[in-house]
Regions:
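Nucleotide-activated chemistry modules centered on ATP-dependent adenylation/adenylyltransferase
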Residues: 1-255, 259-271
Length: 271
C-alpha cells in the first residue's frame, strides 16, 4: 500500500486479518467461551445483538481500530478496560505488583518498534527511485527519495522557505510526484470509503466520522455507491483526509462501521 501512495493503518489491518479471527478460533479449540483483550472499547448488548461503543475513557479510546468486528464476533469478545481509565489500570497493576504498571505508553508499531517505519518499509518493498516534489502549478520545489515516505497532510520533510508552511496535498504514483501546497489545499468535503463493513444494521441519522485514529468526529451524511463502497459528505470540510486510512462511522458513542478511504474523489477535490 505504501508503494501505491496510500497510508495504511497497520493496527486495523492486523485486527482485520490476523488477530481476532485466529484468537477466537484458538479459544474454541480450547473450549473457551470468550476471548479478552486490553483494548479500550466497550461492548453493549442490545436485544439480540451486540454493539461496539467508544471507551468511557476517551483519551485512550481504541474503537477506531476495531471497526471491522461485527455483532457475531463481539458476542465472543470481552473488553474489560472499556469502563475504566488508564490511571486506574496503572493503579490496579501496581497493586498486583506488575512491573509494567508505570511503563511508558508506546506509540510505535509493535512489529517495527522504535525504528522509523520508512526504513522498515523500504527494505521490504520495491520502492520507486527519486522523484520530483512540485506545487499545484507543476513548479519543481525539490526531490524525494520514494513516495512510500509521504502521506497526505504531512509537513515534516516537506521543502519550505516559501513564506508559509507547506504540506503534502497529493501523491501521484504514476508519475512518481509529490504535490505540496498550503493547508487550505488539504480541505476535503466529499470522499469515498471502500471495503465497508458494518457492526450490525445501519441507521443513517446523526452520523459522524473519524478519518484517522483519535481524530475528531466530523458530522457527515453517507450514501451507498455499491455493496462495499459509500460516499461520505462532511457537514464541514476537514483537513488531511489520507487515502489508505480508514473512515470510521459513529452514532454518538456507538460505532456503526467503516471502510478504507480511497483516492478517487479526493483527487477531484484537490484539483
Amino acid at each position: 500500500m505504501y508503494s501505491q501512495g496510500l497510508t495504511p493503518n497497520p493496527c486495523v489491518e492486523c485486527n482485520r486479518s490476523v488477530k481476532f479471527d485466529h484468537f477466537i478460533d484458538q479459544a474454541k479449540k480450547l473450549n473457551c467461551e470468550k476471548v479478552a483483550t486490553g483494548h479500550y472499547a466497550k461492548i453493549v448488548k442490545n436485544s439480540d445483538s451486540f454493539e461496539l461503543h467508544k471507551a468511557d475513557y476517551l483519551d485512550k479510546d481504541q474503537s477506531y481500530v476495531l471497526h471491522m468486528l461485527d455483532s457475531k464476533k463481539l458476542a465472543q469478545i470481552e473488553f474489560p478496560l472499556g469502563t475504566i481509565s488508564k490511571p486506574e489500570v496503572r493503579q490496579i497493576a501496581a497493586t498486583l505488583g506488575l512491573k509494567t504498571a508505570f511503563k511508558k505508553d508506546s506509540q510505535d508499531i509493535c512489529f517495527v518498534g522504535k525504528k522509523d517505519y520508512r526504513n522498515f518499509v523500504s527494505k521490504r518493498i520495491d520502492v520507486s527511485s527519486k522523484g520530483l516534489i512540485v506545487d499545484k502549478h507543476e513548479n519543481e520545489v525539490g526531490t524525494h527519495g520514494g513516495i512510500h515516505a509521504y502521506t497526505i497532510g504531512q509537513r515534516k520533510g516537506v521543502p519550505g522557505g516559501q513564506g508559509e508552511a507547506k504540506y503534502v496535498t497529493k501523491i501521484d504514483v504514476q508519475n512518481n510526484k509529490i504535490y505540496i501546497g498550503s493547508k487550505d489545499e488539504l480541505t476535503t468535503k466529499k470522499f469515498l470509503i471502500e471495503d465497508v463493513s458494518f457492526v450490525d444494521s445501519i441507521e443513517y441519522d446523526n452520523l459522524s466520522i473519524q478519518t484517522r485514529y483519535n481524530s475528531d468526529d466530523v458530522p457527515c451524511n453517507i450514501q451507498k455507491v455499491d455493496e462495499s463502497t459509500y460516499q461520505i459528505e462532511l457537514k464541514n470540510p476537514t483537513l488531511g483526509v489520507a487515502p489508505g486510512q480508514f473512515g470510521v462511522i459513529y452514532q454518538d458513542t456507538k460505532l456503526v462501521g467503516g471502510g478504507r478511504i480511497t483516492s478517487k474523489v479526493l483527487e477531484e477535490v484537490y484539483e
